[in-house]
Each structure stands twice: as structure tokens, then as C-alpha cells.
Amino acid sequence: YEILNYLLGIKISKQSKNSFYKGVFYKPETIIKIRDNISIFSNKKKQEFNNYFKPTKILSPFKLNIKYQKYKKIFDIFSKKIRQGETYQIKICTKYRNKSSINPINFFWRLMKSNASPESFMIRDKNYSIVSCSPETLLLKKGNKIITKPIAGTLRKSKKSNRSSALKFFRNNIKETKEHNMIVDMERSDLSRVCIPGTVKIDKEKYVEEYRHLFHYVTTISGSLLKGMTIKNIIKSMMPGGSVIGCPKVRTLELLNQQEKENRNIFTGSFGYIKFNKDMRFNIIIRSILNYKNTSEISAASGVVLDSAAKKEFNENFIKAKSLLELFK
């Protein structure tokens, strides 16, 4: 998240003892495609493989970085900025942290069984681990076609709810509709900076995707890239994703950086790959666990618009983090 701010010329002064790397880049030496169960044959000692499956150790319970009273103060400040016309929507981030060391392979396997998502990933490095069940595609490029799928709208599942009832809720809810329309317009604008005029279009508008604990309100947008657009041009135009920031993007980022006292680290950043033919795929890092320096961090953010209610948005952050928190039980 922090390095994406720098790309837009936005300075971030805040730091904390839990600050993570600004960016990590890998060049893969081996790519393995798994289509069925696998067996490992190696000259390495068994203990070397066992190190990949060390048990999770939980040393302290999770704590929320800001309580509701503090959240409400930030919410009220942003509500005033919205009334003054400085921003139209803004996403407030909260974090859950505990002291722990995790087995990322086990966590990822369990997460995929219970809450599989299209942009999921797992990284196990000697210094840190990341486990994510992100549902959001920020950027998918194949040839000269580019696609983004912003998510704006979240509904907690109940025993009686289904996709049809969720879609009816979103379409009849003025707040959710406003929020979704603003984010879609911003993502269309971001795409237009790098696409041939007239080619940016909505492929599928306002549909529902279903997950274990919630429903999401999604729109798919595409465009045809202008000739000469570089990887840097595309990344700078599209990142960070508007659906997890708010709009307008630059001013909203500035307002967030004034009130959020800790780095977001990986949260609302992006993970993905770039091929040698310049095709690429990047997600938005949400629904994720960062384990670094024996601390696990789970972040969530919900949107504030003119008619938002602080308590509802605060509780929505918990709903979004719930499936990840359950992994530690």
C-alpha cells in the first residue's frame, strides 16, 4: 500500500514497529502446476521438509488496534470532509493483531476448503508469511485487453439469504448503490487513462458473488490498451484499487494518511505476476494474514459515504475478518 502511494506522489510519514517491506519482488526458478495429489522424491533430509509444516503457535489473543470510540472520531472527521465535498467515499482500516507464528501451508489449505476465492495466494518466506483469500481482481491483462472487477458492497449471510435476496438488497439499498456507482465510475476513469477512447465498457453490471460468510456486489469492466502503454503506465493508473480506498483517489489517500496512524503494510496493496510477454494479473490484497516478526496481522476496511452509520461500518470490518480469525481457533 505504501509504495503505491509513492507512485502517485503521496508522501507517507507514519511508521510503526510492525512496518513491513514496501515491496517484494520474486523471479521464479521453478513453476509447478498441480492437477492431482503429489508425491515428493528428494535427496534432502526429511527434517528439511518437515520445517515447512511446523505447527502454529499462538502466544496471545487478538487485539484490535482501534476501539469503536476512536473509530467513531475518525468516522466523524471523514463524514465532515464528505459534506464539505473533499471526498465522496473513504475506507477506514482496522487491524487485528496477535503474537504468533503460523504454518502458512496449513492455513492456506484450510482457507481454500472453507472460503475459496479467485485471487487467493500464499507466500512462505524465511522472514515472513502471507495467506490470502482475496476475492477481488484489480487488473487482468491479456494481449491488449485489460479487465478490472471492482467489489463495492458487502452483505453478511444469514440462514434465509441467497444470491437472489442479496441482489435485491443491494439494488434496493440507496447507500450501497451510491457506493458501488462511485467506485465503478472511478475504475472506468482509471482504465480510460491507458485505453483507446471509446473501448472502456461494462461487461457485466452489478451482480452478486457468494462466499462463506458474505455476499459481494461486483461489476466487470474492460478496455483495449493504447499502443505504447508500459507496465509502469498501467500499474500507476490502476493502483491502489479504488474499491478499498474511496474516491476521488488522490485526495482520499491524503485524508486517510492524515488519520491512520499505522502503515497498512500489505493490506490494500496488490499481489500478482507479470509474464515475459507482458500479460499480467494483480489482485487487491484483502482478506489476508501477514505473519512477520512473530506477529499476525489481519486488516479490514469498510466504506464511509454521506449516509453511512459508524456502528454498521465498524461491525462490517469484523464480518470481513471473521473467516481469517477463525483459523486461529
Predicted feature locations:
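Extended alpha-helical targeting/anchoring segments
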Residues: 1-329
